[in-house]
Amino acid sequence: MLARSAASLSTTAATTQSNMSVTSQFMDANDCKFIVYKASQIRLTEMKRLLGVLVPNLKKRSSQNKNIVPLVTYMLPLLAGPVLNVNAALKEKYNQIVQGQEPTKDNKDYDVTPRDWLTYVMDSNTQNQPLEGCELVEFKKELYDKDKQWLTVTRLLKLIDEVISTYNNKFKSANLLKKTYSKSIEDLIKPSELSLCLDLAVLITDYERDTSEASFRKLQWQVIEKFLATLHSKVEPTLKTYYKSLLAYQSGKLMLYKLPFPEWTIHRMFAFTVRMISLMKLFGCELRVLYYPNRKYLNDLKTKLVCENVYKYDLLITQIEKLCADPLYQIKESKEMMQFFQKYPYSLPKSLPQKTHEFFIKKVISTCINHWNNNTKLVEDWVEMWKFCDKNNSAKEKIESSNEEQLIKMYDERYTVDKLVYLEHEEERAKLSNKKSIGIVVKSSSSSSPNKLLRKLSPISGMAKPKVRSTKSPASSSSSNSNSNSALSSGMATPKERSRRSSVDRGLPKGGRLPGLTKTNTNERLVAPLIHISETSSVSNSGSSSINASPLGSRRGSIKDESAARKMVINRTVERTRSKIGNRPRSASLQSNESAALNSVGIVGSPLSNNRLPKPVSNQSQLRSNSLESNSALNRKMVQDTFKHLMANNPKPSNLSHSPTSSPMRPSSPIPSRSNSNKVSSTNNGAILSPEPKGKSKANNSNDKIKTNGVTSINIDNSDNEIVLKPLPHESKDTTTGPVRPVDESVNNLSEGTPAGSESTPESMKSAVGIEGLDKENLNVESGNMESGEPSKKVRFVGVPPMTEAENPKPTRKGWYKKPAVLHYPPVPQQVTMFRDRLRQEGMVFRTSLRDTVAATSNEVGKKGGMMLSLAIDNPPVKEISSHSRFASKLREKLTR
């Protein structure tokens, strides 16, 4: 047994090794001739057999008082191709039969030279040329002529017998019957489409009705649909199966020895090519019989006007015309294929069959398959359009009474409109296909590296890019500002992210000014009305010494429209810059609350700026709790409650405001430019302007302008509604003289808006006189909610003088805010209680026997000191619906029984 099994294994291994070492046999000119002859012989033999079956059956039924007409006109194209094109005499006989004439008697032998295979395979001047000029009426009359159709069948059978005998003689003379690979190509050259002949017959019961124009068109549709169905169901499966195996072999997925008949691969590929060429010629000839008799009707203006799309219809008709004129025009236009065929098979390298395989698959077979698919799709679309035109009766009635000029005009209009529609539709299809392909690539790339994509989208992944300051006109600045805000609104960071990023920002280089953008997320729950902020002066970036010496400022986004701002969230881009003065970075805990900008109002005193006093702001307080959670609603509410409590105990107002920051300005700038953000820069020594009360906004909305150089602080006391002008102790060293307005007019304009009973102090008027002759400075204004009387804290930085006691009074109570009375912790998770109760239940079940009484159990536990069980009995757990509790309850029930 072991010897037999070893022998069988060795035989199998030897067979497998021999199969893997199979090489394709070489092909010569005799092989080409044999394949063409064999294909023609099989086709003729099959056609003769089918006609021999069809004719007796039709004659038998006709004798039973049934008028059955064989449609031989549609059978003749099935013999097109290299079958009857071996010689000019045979071609002439074939054409005479198509015309309904008696073929000439000629019994001479038809010879074909070995190199002439391309001529009788690719010749296109041999099929149904007389049909090109026929009329529909004459064609229909001959088609339904029963006697003439039977006569054509007899002539065709006689011609088939002559050609079969000719091929048999050629096989004998050329000694081609010894070819051993005939069975290897039979599956590819088998004419399965000839079975259509058995269906090409029509039964006529009422001659007038069955031969009408509508019935004739319906018959043509049935013929072409039956023809296409036969091709799709019986011809294409075998060819496409072998084509797929060839593609797998070309790509390396399939070895040569796994192909069918691997040693005859070149012969099979040549047979495949001859088969495809024959099918394409057959297809074109069948299309001729259907199109040429209806050409006049299909090209009529009335037919075109009732179609679905005039431009698409014209394209289809043009392609059908070319296909009928020469079914192989697409192959002949390929110069590479024609050059290969002209030299084939003498150009085949005997030592390199693999290159021949690749060329055959890529250049010849794939090209034929593509042309075949395009042609079948073209005919299917044409038949659908033809049916639509014939059944569109409503459109036919509308254009029935139109003359030729009106039809031409309507056609031109339809052609222009339909062309645009068709081209747009094709562009959309192309874009959709591109999007699908791009989506697949993006999906694969994103799934392979999702972390990389998240790092790109995350605002904390790295430092933000520095923002370049520019001096633009107000219009251009505001437009660019809105664009930048809309572009950055989707990727803004939260206040927590900004506070965490402060530790990263401390790594900036010393000395030089490196501004960094921080993308902030707008609080979508707060929607403030429109806030009018005056335009700031342009920022100078020429002097590096002034930039390094001055504190750094922050600017906010541009102003939105009043109607739009009441409905949408204000998107703001905050620019924060860091600098180290005295080797100490800016503290992250002293950042101003970003949500304060929603209730901020600022006015910059400039002779050329169009200043507008603020409109009423919302009553919602925007005080900050701490820098780490400045945007938290809970902490903000706690801070508001704390300050309300403090203000109730200490009614004395404290002059508090948000943190001012300063930025340099260009003294020589003639036109003030709106900054890229909503917040205005302040002066070097921290001059601020607090907003006026609610009642002053309308009165002060005129062209009121204030001039200051940064040495004066204009404060509004909320207690008695006074405007106070206070001189600050330090003057800016960089100020230059510029054109100014008298301050008295500005102060008077401000005073006009104050309520009755408010008056300016002499000290403030004295300080106002000193404003003349001083240069303008850029002011940073941040307003608090002055309607409720709540103060805000003014924060100073390095290089800014400290606040006086009057400006910053000491608080009466210690601590930033009081601690809450009760700490509300979240509820205990349900899983914890379930686990605890489950332990108690299991203890009750398994520690003691449940068959005893509860009293005995409790006494026993009391003696043993079982505290856990006693607690469990005193406080029975709540029954839960879970898998574990169900299991315990079932076990307990079984034990208690």
From Swiss-Prot:
Its main location: cytoplasm. Keywords: Cytoplasm. It comes from Candida glabrata (strain ATCC 2001 / BCRC 20586 / JCM 3761 / NBRC 0622 / NRRL Y-65 / CBS 138). InterPro entries: GIP4. This is GLC7-interacting protein 4. Interacts with GLC7. GO terms for molecular function: protein phosphatase 1 binding; protein phosphatase regulator activity. GLC7 phosphatase-regulatory protein involved in GLC7 subcellular redistribution and chromosome segregation. Residues 444-459, 473-490, 537-554, 657-677 have a biased composition (Low complexity). The keyword Cytoplasm applies. The keyword Glycosyltransferase does not apply. Belongs to the GIP4 family. Residues 678-687, 698-718, 746-764 have a biased composition (Polar residues). Residues 444-523, 537-562, 607-632, 647-794 are annotated as: Disordered. Residues 495-508 have a biased composition (Basic and acidic residues). GO terms for cellular component: cytoplasm. It is found in: Cytoplasm. Disulfide bonds: none annotated.
